[in-house]
Amino acid sequence: MENLLNEIVEEVITRVKKEAFIEVEASGRHVHLSREDVDKLFGEGYTLTKLKDLSQPGQYACKERVTITGPKGSIKNVVVLGPCRNETQVEISLTDGSTLGLKAPIKQSGDLEGTLSIKISTQYGEVELDKGLMVAKRHIHMTPKDAEKFNVCDKEIVEAKVMGQRPLTFDDVVIRVSDSFKTYMHIDYDEANACGYSKGTVAKIIKKA
């Protein structure tokens, strides 16, 4: 009887979390490559090797790794995400920027205006980007249905209280709504460390007045 009650309580808690909270994911440094740059880094016509699917539909981590280099230093074994994009983009944390000797701007993914140059290399080749290095702005991917439920809209800026081991309210969180998304909040590892993130951490949206 006690086990049954515990199962019921756990199910109720899970349902409440899904209704009121959003699951948080921490994203490490990574690279999105254009078709042209895949050819330069791995060879003409090379196909990236899918390693595992990510939470967002159609997105996946690849087996391939690259090195990124700035004026002060390099970071090896940076994961490549697929599929290919129109333009190459490198997403790092502010701490990574210190290692590289670069103060990368905080930008939304895909907005390359004002981003920095960076070198990407493998044992087969290298690419010198004129732009593309950024720190990703913290954001929430959201389905239209969930956007309606949480009463938010695409590109809206909200606060989000992350219930990690050290609960923390983040300001300047951008909502991104699309039929192609699953609902997750994305932060980088600097932010994850600040709030004591662990797998299963959730966040609550706080609407701005």
Swiss-Prot record:
It is found in: Bacterial microcompartment. Pathway: Polyol metabolism; 1,2-propanediol degradation. Its EC number is 2.3.1.222. CoA binds at residues 26-28, 72, 193. It catalyses: propanoyl-CoA + phosphate = propanoyl phosphate + CoA. Phosphate binds at residue 85. There are 2 Zn(2+) ions per monomer; Zn(2+) and CoA bind inbetween the 2 domains in each monomer. Its cofactor is Zn(2+). One of its GO terms (cellular component) is bacterial microcompartment. InterPro entries: PTAC (IPR008300). Its main location: other. Zn(2+) 1 binds at residues 30, 32, 91. One of its GO terms (molecular function) is metal ion binding. Formed by 2 beta-barrels, each is capped on both ends by short alpha-helices. NCBIfam families: BMC_EutD_Gpos, PRK15070.1. Involved in 1,2-propanediol (1,2-PD) utilization within the bacterial microcompartment (BMC) dedicated to 1,2-PD degradation by catalyzing the conversion of propanoyl-CoA to propanoyl-phosphate. This is Phosphate propanoyltransferase.
